[in-house]
Amino acid sequence: MEKCTESLPNLNAETSFLRGGNLILQPQVQHPTDDKPPITGQVVPALNTPVMSGPYSGDHIPQFHGNPASVKGFFAQVTTYLRALDISNPADNARVKHFFDYLSQQMQNCDVLSESTQNNLLKQYENFVLELQQSFGEPMTQETTPPMNVTVDKSNISPQDATNFQLHAPNLSYRETNQRDQFQNGQADPTQNEEITDIMDNLPDLITQCIQLDKKHKDRPELLQSESHVPMFASTNHYQSFIGPVRPLPKDGPRQLQGAHLPVTPAKRARQQETQLCVYCNQAGHFTRDCLAKRSRTPARKKM
């Protein structure tokens, strides 16, 4: 109150100027207190001159000379001043906080302003803060989530904010519905389940067909023996046929050539490979593909 009574003429002049949409900050006379050092009528140099940043004190509060054309011009002047300070984080800087407190105090002292003028000043002040954050590399808009323990005052919500919330609410619900549907589709794929079910249902039929084919080819044991394993023992068989005596033919050899042969089991095939006998006629001294009995049973191919 003492401050306002001392600068009453200046305050009235400022009030009339603010009603016209402009803001003028005149040097105010303030009494020293114990908490903050006295604020002097220091004049900030011209905008083109860089301001040197020094230790924080009350003397660094800007007292701009001249009359800015409008509040927007004044805020642009303040922005240039704060950019010249080269502050890395303006939100935590003591000078910026002190300047904002000083500016808020000056605006509160002008309590005779109309409501519309105060709203315009507040809007320009918010724009100034956004421009200042952008100048330091911070984004203009940030998506923030309010804490759970913070209560929202519904009286401060503007109609525009309520309209934006109503427009975004269906989009959020639509996204949640799409994500839920995609998760359910990925969790249970009907086509994949049908394919697995068909394979399991056809498995007994496949086993039955394999058994029938095995019974059909029992009279042809050469089909049960893979010819791919034969070349592995070719060199050994020919080498032993030259350097070693030929084993005598067993007595039941002619009967084996005339009668039918039983299918070769895996155990018998392994034993024959160990003794290096013919897989078809169970005789030594020749290879399976050179067996005469096999050739005699194989039907002759017709020449085209």
UniProtKB/Swiss-Prot annotation:
| Start and end residues, zinc fingers (CCHC-type) | 276-293
Q: Which SUPFAM superfamilies match?
A: Retrovirus zinc finger-like domains
Keywords, ordered alphabetically:
Metal-binding, Zinc, Zinc-finger
GO BP annotation list: cognition; norepinephrine metabolic process
Extract the InterPro entries matched here.
Znf_CCHC, Znf_CCHC_sf
Query: Where does tissue-level expression of this protein occur?
Result: In adults, expressed in brain, eye, kidney, ovary and testis. Weakly expressed in thymus, heart and muscle.
Query: Which Gene Ontology MF annotations are present?
Result: nucleic acid binding; zinc ion binding
Loss of function: phenotype: Mutants are viable and don't show growth retardation in the pre- and postnatal periods in either female or male mice. Animals are fertile, even in the case of mating between mutants. They exhibit abnormal behaviors related to cognition, including attention, impulsivity, and working memory. Animals show a reduced recovery rate of noradrenaline in the prefrontal cortex region.
* Other information: RTL4 is one of at least 11 genes called Mar or Mart related to long terminal repeat retrotransposons. They do not correspond to functional retrotransposons, but rather to neofunctionalized retrotransposons genes.
What does the protein in this record do? Involved in cognitive function in the brain, possibly via the noradrenergic system.
Q: What is this protein called?
A: Retrotransposon Gag-like protein 4
